[in-house]
Amino acid sequence: MKIRAMVTVKGMVQGVNFRRYTQQTAMRFNVSGWVKNLPNGSVAGCFEGEENDVAALIDWCRQGPGSARVSGVEVERGEFTGEFDDFHIAY
C-alpha cells in the first residue's frame, strides 16, 4: 500500500548535508517527495511511496548521516497523492 508521511527531523540537522543524504537515501528506497530546511533549525520532508519503503526512510532519518545529531523525528501520516515524480531538495 502506498502512503504519504510528513516528517520533521529535529536536532543538529542543518549544515551537515542532511538534505542531500536524505535525497540519496530516498532514491535508493524508491520514495518520492521533497526535503527542506526550516527556519527553526529543523528539516521537514514529504515522503511518498510503498509503506515499507517510506518506513525505511523514516528509520534512516532517526539516525541521519554521521555528521548529524538527531534529537527527534515527528511523523504525520496521510493519504498517498502521487503528485511527485522524483525526490528533490526544496528551498
From Swiss-Prot:
It comes from the Bacteria. GO terms for molecular function: acylphosphatase activity. Residues 4-91 form the Acylphosphatase-like domain. The keyword tRNA processing does not apply. Its EC number is 3.6.1.7. InterPro entries: Acylphosphatase, Acylphosphatase-like_dom, Acylphosphatase-like_dom_sf, Acylphosphatase_CS. Keywords: Hydrolase. The active site is at R19, N37. It catalyses: an acyl phosphate + H2O = a carboxylate + phosphate + H(+). Belongs to the acylphosphatase family. This is Acylphosphatase. It comes from Geotalea uraniireducens (strain Rf4).
